[in-house]
Curated annotation (Swiss-Prot):
Changing Q182K: In DIH4; decreased retinoic acid biosynthetic process. Its EC number is 1.2.1.36. This is Retinal dehydrogenase 2. It is found in: Cytoplasm. The keyword Transport does not apply.
Length: 518
């Protein structure tokens, strides 16, 4: 094959002096943030749980309690489903609303998120531990773009006429499915909230959504904005609670027509089983990953090192897309490892509210312990620990940026999703070899390849068993493009036009006519 060079975006290198000089231009966290919304949101009203139970919410940077939130269980889910079914009933305000008006409401919601962007970013940092500037510029930007993207789609979803045989007039309608149950994770609480509700509302559905018990605060705040935007009562209902109670009630509820879940593969299996046992509700699952990132010797090495670093360590490594299996061609392996270790050692770990922080804490003690246990397994199985590997001796759940070399495919750290700041670097010799090894996984969410040869890039991308493949980039997610997994990384697609298919049913209508004319 003839080599054809691919143009890559230039690497951005931060000037520390320039950064410090420009800090006054950056957005600031909201000081003394008041947590106003801690109750269940049903029918546009704030309510206590039927049981009267509450649960604590923590700041992972300190381990200290922030507040208590009402704990929803099956009784509360029943109330929410009843409200959502009423809002979806024929002749309701929501069902009779013009599609363009649904779009206007989503646009209004985006406006309100923009207005309260600093408050919401502060909440994501306080409750989730992510750096404030990441929350402000990445998470909140994604939320706003998602709402605006689907606002534009609302009055552009339509069927078609079909020239069937005989004296008939046949057309299709794209109708909302009904009441959608949605369960979202703790790693991107607000972004996943938007990913779930925006396409559902765009298509005219109603929603019962459960945020993760670790991070309910931003979702509850959105309840106030939803009401302010003018959504009718019962259209969106927000219920904080635990998976085995509130989550299980959503998955098995016969009054829910569709369920969408983002989280672990293990829980995804349980949800699909519950959906089948109850009313065979429609299911969309966005699950775990163990994504390969393939670096060829002809790649721009500095650029590839930085992209691979961000692809693993972004969001404290708490990404389903994390490129944790980094396959590096043998001739550049040692140099790639050396530069990756240097970069990991420069990574700034600290308070989420410090503008120089790149990495905050893990979400909770359970995840912290799981990550450290997997790191120890890597050492025990013979991988070389190049740097990191320990928790930091401070309050909160901080872990050092960790890099392993000499990793082999049979090690636990090469097979299991770590969901933490741990980079595993493997070596390969040939393209055929690396394709086979990269695909040798139960997961198939994303993959990436770095090379200046377009033929290599397209050969690898077409061979990868993954829902998304990035060439000379990583984590390039957009509201306009579909996202979802192969194999045990899930089913269905979110985002883009394809995301609308998950929230609509196609109905065929045929009319007998006296005479058909072409």
């Amino acid at each position: 094959m003839t080599s054809s060079k691919i143009e890559m975006p230039g690497e951005v290198k931060a000037d520390p002096a320039a950064l410090m000089a420009s800090l006054h231009l950056l957005p600031s966290p909201t000081p003394n943030l008041e947590i106003k919304y801690t109750k269940i949101f049903i029918n546009n009203e704030w309510q206590n749980s039927e049981s009267g139970r509450v649960f604590p919410v923590y700041n992972p940077a300190t381990g200290e309690q922030v507040c208590e939130v009402q704990e929803a269980d099956k009784a509360d889910i029943d109330k929410a489903v009843q409200a959502a079914r009423l809002a979806f009933s024929l002749g309701s305000v929501w069902r009779r609303m013009d599609a363009s008006e649904r779009g206007r409401l989503l646009d209004k919601l985006a406006d309100l998120v923009e207005r309260d962007r600093a408050v919401l970013a502060t909440m994501e940092s306080l409750n989730g531990g992510k750096p404030f500037l990441q929350a402000f510029y990445v998470d909140l930007q994604g939320v706003i773009k998602t709402f605006r993207y689907y606002a534009g789609w609302a009055d552009k979803i339509h069927g078609m006429t079909i020239p069937v045989d005989g004296d008939y007039f046949t057309f299709t309608r794209h109708e909302p499915i009904g009441v959608c149950g949605q369960i979202i994770p703790w790693n991107f609480p607000l972004l996943m909230f938007a990913w779930k509700i925006a396409p559902a509302l765009c298509c005219g559905n109603t929603v019962v959504i459960k945020p993760a018990e670790q991070t309910p605060l931003s979702a509850l705040y959105m309840g106030a904005l939803i009401k302010e935007a003018g959504f009718p009562p019962g259209v969106i209902n927000i219920l904080p609670g635990y998976g085995p109670t509130a989550g299980a009630a959503i998955a098995s509820h016969i009054g829910i027509d569709k369920i969408a879940f983002t989280g672990s593969t293990e829980v995804g299996k349980l949800i699909q089983e519950a959906a089948g046992r109850s009313n065979l509700k429609r299911v969309t699952l966005e699950l775990g990953g163990k994504s390969p990132n393939i670096i060829f010797a002809d790649a721009d090495l500095d650029y590839a090192v930085e992209q691979a670093h961000q692809g693993v360590f972004f969001n404290q490594g708490q990404c389903c897309t994390a490129g944790s299996r980094i396959f590096v061609e043998e001739s550049i392996y040692e140099e790639f490892v050396r530069r990756s270790v240097e970069r990991a050692k420069r990574r700034v770990v600290g308070s989420p509210f410090d503008p120089t922080t790149e990495q905050g804490p893990q979400i909770d003690k359970k995840q912290y312990n799981k990550i450290l246990e997997l790191i120890q397994s890597g050492v025990a199985e013979g991988a070389k620990l190049e740097c990191g590997g320990k928790g930091l001796g401070r309050k909160g759940f901080f872990i050092e940026p960790t890099v392993f070399s000499n990793v082999t495919d049979d090690m636990r750290i090469a097979k299991e999703e770590i969901f933490g700041p741990v980079q595993e670097i493997l070596r390969f010799k040939t393209m055929d070899e690396v394709i086979e090894r990269a695909n040798n996984s139960d997961f198939g969410l994303v993959a990436a390849v770095f090379t200046n040869d377009i033929n290599k890039a397209l050969t690898v991308s077409s061979a990868m068993q993954a829902g998304t493949v990035w060439i000379n980039c990583y984590n390039a997610l957009n509201a306009q493009s579909p996202f979802g997994g192969f194999k045990m990384s899930g089913n269905g697609r979110e985002m883009g036009e394809f995301g609308l298919r998950e929230y609509s049913e196609v109905k065929t209508v045929t009319v007998k006519i006296p005479q058909k004319n072409s």
